[in-house]
Amino acid sequence: MERRADAATGKRPIRSFVRREGRLTAGQQRALELLWPAFGLERPPAGQPLDLDRAFGRRAPRILEIGFGNGESLAEQAATHPERDYLGIEVHRPGVGHLLMEVEKRHLGNVRVMMADAAEVLAHHIPDGSLHGVQLFFPDPWPKKRHHKRRLVQPQWVRAVAAKLAPGGFLHLATDWADYAEHMLDVLEAEPDLENTCGPRQFSPRGERPETKFERRGLRKGHQVFDLYYRKREHPG
């Protein structure tokens, strides 16, 4: 995966992630080799949109999940909602391999996967108004103050998400870092095209988001999980 410079400034964008490759299991390696051609999507050339109708072979409500980890949550949702299409973006190959294994095991035809910088894909390759929902669950909190600029949830990113959502489309975030949760609220409440479904500055119930092993482990340690659920206004300003 290449790192493309910003067309206007020529500068490399600030990354919200670090590629911690980790070791691939034999099953993950096999899945990447055999299943990627069917379920993996390459990033299009600069300025060209993803043709998701062609990629999925149909037109259906589309959910984008950014940073899906090992894909446990995404696979569960795709199995529960076969009427929806799920595009997952993740930079870590072991997680992509694990999701592809789940896709095969569960016979999920409504999942496609990309290994790319999700912020760049969102900005340059997703048509405006084309998404039914965007999900970001447990992103890197970058807890040190000097690293806060690396947090994915920033005003520019939220503005881009709002543009890609269809009217009535949702943005669902979750984190177990209280400081990041408050930061998310600050940024989201300032976006005029999004409305908090639970009221101003309110956190949301977990709703349809599956509880993952990672989350259950944190809850046993006493971590609190914060969900935020917003919808794009039907008549955005």
UniProtKB/Swiss-Prot annotation:
Residues 197-217 are annotated as: Disordered. InterPro entries: SAM-dependent_MTases_sf (IPR029063), tRNA_(Gua-N-7)_MeTrfase_Trmb (IPR003358), tRNA_methyltr_TrmB_bact (IPR055361). Pathway: tRNA modification; N(7)-methylguanine-tRNA biosynthesis. Its EC number is 2.1.1.33. Signal peptide: none annotated. PROSITE patterns: SAM_MT_TRMB. It catalyses: guanosine(46) in tRNA + S-adenosyl-L-methionine = N(7)-methylguanosine(46) in tRNA + S-adenosyl-L-homocysteine. One of its GO terms (molecular function) is tRNA (guanine(46)-N7)-methyltransferase activity. The keyword Membrane does not apply. Keywords: Methyltransferase, S-adenosyl-L-methionine, Transferase, tRNA processing. HAMAP family: tRNA_methyltr_TrmB. This is tRNA (guanine-N(7)-)-methyltransferase. The lineage of its organism: Bacteria, Pseudomonadati, Pseudomonadota, Gammaproteobacteria, Chromatiales.
